[in-house]
């Protein structure tokens, strides 16, 4: 029985073909630099369209003494339209995203775009978010099996959270 199953599986895998122009496995160097575990998978669905699925996970407390943390997980599906050919050159992107976070006692994040990031130094937030956005990017082909891409985008997110006073000891003071 096992011999037949092995032969069947080997024949299926030898008949199936895939090339670098049909799919890609990727990582985000920015997240890698912040010790966030991340992985992406992109697959071609038409001549100039791909779907990208990426995820990110950071389970680490940065400083256990002060309870400084930026813990999170999120998933981001994205559709991309390529102007020239898939996986190379200019592209437009539309994405959704959602996840969960536990962030507090972080005092190095600047205020930008109407956020309340400076509050992270005095409070801890635990919650969920969901959102959508658009982007523009470019992918440079470095070789037969290697690309590097850059993307800039804008989007919005809706978040609901519990707010805790004192980033370390944490008595709950409200919800949103």
Q: Across the structure, where does each feature detected by a protein language model lie?
A:
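N-terminal secretory signal peptides that target proteins for export/translocation
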Residues: 1-2
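Bacterial N-terminal signal peptides
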Residues: 6-14
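Sec/Tat signal peptide C-region and signal peptidase I cleavage site
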Residues: 15-22
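Short N-terminal segments immediately surrounding and downstream of signal-peptide cleavage
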Residues: 22-36
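A short local loop/turn or secondary-structure capping micro-motif enriched for an aromatic residue
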Residues: 33, 59-61, 157-158
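Short, surface-exposed coil-to-beta transition loops
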Residues: 35-38, 133
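Predominantly the C-terminal beta-signal and adjacent terminal strand-loop region
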Residues: 143-176
């Amino acid at each position: 029985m096992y011999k037949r199953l092995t032969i069947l599986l080997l024949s299926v895998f030898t008949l199936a073909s895939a090339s670098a122009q049909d799919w890609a496995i990727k990582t985000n160097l920015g997240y890698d630099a912040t010790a966030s575990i991340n992985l992406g998978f992109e697959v071609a669905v038409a001549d100039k369209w791909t779907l990208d699925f990426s995820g990110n996970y950071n389970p680490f407390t940065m400083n256990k003494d002060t309870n400084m943390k930026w813990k999170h997980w999120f998933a981001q599906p994205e559709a991309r339209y390529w102007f020239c050919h898939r996986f190379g050159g200019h592209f437009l992107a539309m994405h959704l995203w959602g996840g969960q976070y536990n962030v507090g006692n972080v005092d190095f994040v600047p205020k930008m775009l109407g956020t309340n990031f400076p509050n992270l130094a005095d409070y801890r937030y635990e919650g969920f978010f969901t959102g959508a956005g658009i982007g523009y990017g470019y992918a440079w082909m470095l070789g037969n099996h290697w690309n590097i891409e850059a993307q800039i985008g804008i989007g919005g997110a809706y978040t609901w959270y519990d707010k805790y006073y004192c980033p370390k000891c944490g008595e709950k003071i409200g919800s949103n």
